[in-house]
Amino acid sequence: MTINQLLQKLDTSSPILQATFGLERENLRVTTDGHLAQTAHPSQLGSRNFHPTIQTDFSEQQLELITPIAHSTKEARRLLGAISDVAGRSIDQSECLWPLSMPPQLTEEDIIIARLENEYERHYREGLAKKYGKKLQAISGIHYN
């Protein structure tokens, strides 16, 4: 019996079926020729420190898209799609959001550590770069919360 079959047999009031969900997706901003964008975080999105759903992850080029709490996986996917649309429309016209987890063509020099206002956050990212290298931090993906 699969997990889906087991879940379908549960009473709808079962606590496991009352779960909430959240998704986080990291995307690199790249130019149309597949190189990392060298532009700053899109100003149309406002402050990355306070935007509830679109922030910056490790690098200046790495957007982090964050859904609010959803009450179903379908709702979480819908929210992520809407946030992705906003992000895609907010970046420079010569850029796109790289859809894969492995980065395109890049060198350590191409990766700009996020220009964050919070000194602790900046130092944290600089420490990651020294310990693991910038390329490893550029790997992007989806996180399920």
Give residue ranges: language-model regions.
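A broad, structural surface signal
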Residues: 25, 78-92, 122, 126, ...
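Histidine-centered divalent-metal-coordination microenvironment in nucleic-acid enzymes
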Residues: 26, 136-145
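Residue-level recognition of well-ordered beta-strand positions that form the cores
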Residues: 28, 66-68, 145
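Active-site acidic/histidine clusters and adjacent loop/turn architecture
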Residues: 41-117
